[in-house]
């Protein structure tokens, strides 16, 4: 190598040792990860095993790769992506995201480990630890983004059904985008990070020259300082968020459009209605909404923070410049989580001490580090993903003018005052076109359509529960009978039959007719398959090992089907419980006869 050290002490012995280990423990692993290319012979040998779909190699000394690729032909492996070589020095956010969120890498993320191809690479200890931590973090983020909490999903479905009449009888998100795109060059997104306070005087001075998009938590702060936003965006489904609207600012609210999600807490709507605020509900990332087919009311940008949604709105309205302020995504030097005007500051007491040292990230400006949190790190991940996509389009510049907190990759870091002076020369005509609700006739049509779909889904829950229970009882009974069988071959035959029966049931779960249940089932399906991968890669050495692996496989699926049944039952109850506002709306509109026809069709 360039530093006159050897890649191997004894190449043949080390190769044989590694092959013995991998052919023993990791024979069935679809994906293997290595740091260091070495002489490449190990990868050539491992890829003879058809179970290994991909070998991912991270290397920082590209000269080694050039030499070895010259000596050995890997053209076919590289062409088929069986061998993936990544330069450690140039890895970016998108590289990690593409790897960790796509299959089979994502599907086998819980079997991930990083191995050194030889002892030579131990000298890169710091880079290896950093790489390993990045991969683990990105796999975690990918899992979280796919959904991991069924209770959250159920709450979202409940509140969606409850809120449907309010959504349909208010303005549609797509109408907003059509009527107001290209009306403003610059949008300023206001969040409640610790750095916001110092930016408020500048924001007030330039508020009439740009579109102001406020997070719900920033709205009371802006009202206090008499800075009127054009849009206030709310994302959370919890009751606490509704308190941001439990106030009366009188004429200040005139011409502000409040945008909240389909799954917002009903109290948020009550607080908005109480003072006659102009609001709309828009959906985001909802499989049940896709089932209802009301496309005109979405789709808000994906992501786990209100800043993501606000940024998506700014992009969809075709702003050429988007500026973040108060988007710290980190604690201040004195340990504060938010600006000191933030109404829920006391809810975050002790969080700085809890998170200290665990989520440290690069500071704004690229010098030093700041303390972040798990959720801020997650928010930043999705925001950076969205910014990357926007940057690829080339029509918009994204500026981080927070002047504090964490660095957000993909943004241009500039002082807020400088960007206002550069971009905001003239007043903006804020007499934006009015967005009106759909006609009464169209509303009636959508209300009835949604009612029909919900009743149909309730019926689907009932019928599929029965079908699933029948399959479950059959599999459970056959599985229990294994205790009465002493012959291994006979037991294996029964297990193979049960695995086929399991596959038939799982195939039904993937049918497009299950669209109304995708949302409630997706979190447990994802988590189950990720955990199942750990069983899949077990390498049985004996007939007993093979039998026990199949036994474990069937046992896990029996428990899984019980969970599926419970979740479908929960959705059925949620739909029945929360359909009342929609029923009342239909009654008020003299649509009772259509409601009765739908109920009769499905015996509801």
Report each predicted region and the residues it spans:
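Proline-aspartate-enriched helix->loop->beta-strand connector
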Residues: 52, 229, 319-322
């Amino acid at each position: 190598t360039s530093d006159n050290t050897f890649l191997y002490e004894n190449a043949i012995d080390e190769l044989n040792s590694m092959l013995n280990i991998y052919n023993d423990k990791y024979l069935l692993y679809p994906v293997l990860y290595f740091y260091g290319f070495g002489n490449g012979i190990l990868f050539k040998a491992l890829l003879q095993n058809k179970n290994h779909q991909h070998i991912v190699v991270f290397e920082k000394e590209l000269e080694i790769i050039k030499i070895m690729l010259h000596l050995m032909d890997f053209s076919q492996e590289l062409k088929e992506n069986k061998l993936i070589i990544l330069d450690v020095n140039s890895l970016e956010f998108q590289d990690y995201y593409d790897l960790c969120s796509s299959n089979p890498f994502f599907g086998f993320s819980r079997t991930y480990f990083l191995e050194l191809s030889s002892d030579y690479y131990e000298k890169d200890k710091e880079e290896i630890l950093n790489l390993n931590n990045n991969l683990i973090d990105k796999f975690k983020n990918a899992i979280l983004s796919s959904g991991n909490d069924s209770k959250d999903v159920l709450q979202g479905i409940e509140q969606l059904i409850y809120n449907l009449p309010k959504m349909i009888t208010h303005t549609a998100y797509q109408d907003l985008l059509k009527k107001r795109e290209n009306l403003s060059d610059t949008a300023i997104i206001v969040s409640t990070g610790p750095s916001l306070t110092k930016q408020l005087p500048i924001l007030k001075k330039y508020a009439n020259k740009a579109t102001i998009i406020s997070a719900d938590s920033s709205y009371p702060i802006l009202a206090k300082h008499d800075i009127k936003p054009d849009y206030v965006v709310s994302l959370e489904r919890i009751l606490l968020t509704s308190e941001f609207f439990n106030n009366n600012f009188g004429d200040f609210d005139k011409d502000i459009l409040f945008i909240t999600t389909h799954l917002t807490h009903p109290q948020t709507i009550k607080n908005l209605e109480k003072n006659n605020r102009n609001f709309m509900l828009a959906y985001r990332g909802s499989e049940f909404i896709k089932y209802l087919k009301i496309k005109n009311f979405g789709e808000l940008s994906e992501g786990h923070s209100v800043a993501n949604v606000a940024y998506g709105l700014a992009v969809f309205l075709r702003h050429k410049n988007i500026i973040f302020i108060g988007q710290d995504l980190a604690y201040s030097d004195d340990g504060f989580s938010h600006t000191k005007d933030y109404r829920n500051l006391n809810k975050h007491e002790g969080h700085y001490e809890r998170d200290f040292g665990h989520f440290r990230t690069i500071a704004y400006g690229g010098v030093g580090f700041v303390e972040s949190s798990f959720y801020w790190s997650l928010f930043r991940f999705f925001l950076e993903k969205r910014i990357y996509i926007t940057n690829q389009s080339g029509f918009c510049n994204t500026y981080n003018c927070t002047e504090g907190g964490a660095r957000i990759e993909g943004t241009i870091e500039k002082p807020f005052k400088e960007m206002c002076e550069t971009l905001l020369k003239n007043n903006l005509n804020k007499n934006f076109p009015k967005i009106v609700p759909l006609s009464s006739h169209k509303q009636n049509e959508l209300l009835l359509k949604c009612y029909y779909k919900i009743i149909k889904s309730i019926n689907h829950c009932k019928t599929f529960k029965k079908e699933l229970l029948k399959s479950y009882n059959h599999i459970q009974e056959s599985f229990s009978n294994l205790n009465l069988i002493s012959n291994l071959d006979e037991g294996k035959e029964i297990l193979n039959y049960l695995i086929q029966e399991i596959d038939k049931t799982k195939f039904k779960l993937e049918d497009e007719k299950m669209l109304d249940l995708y949302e409630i089932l997706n979190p447990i399906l994802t988590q189950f398959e990720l955990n199942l991968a750990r069983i899949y890669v077990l390498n049985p050495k004996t007939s007993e090992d093979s039998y026990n692996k199949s036994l474990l496989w069937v046992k896990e699926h029996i428990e899984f089907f019980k969970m599926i049944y419970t979740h479908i039952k929960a959705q059925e109850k949620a739909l029945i419980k929360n359909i009342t506002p929609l029923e009342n709306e239909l009654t008020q509109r003299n649509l009772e006869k259509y409601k009765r026809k739908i109920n009769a069709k499905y015996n509801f």
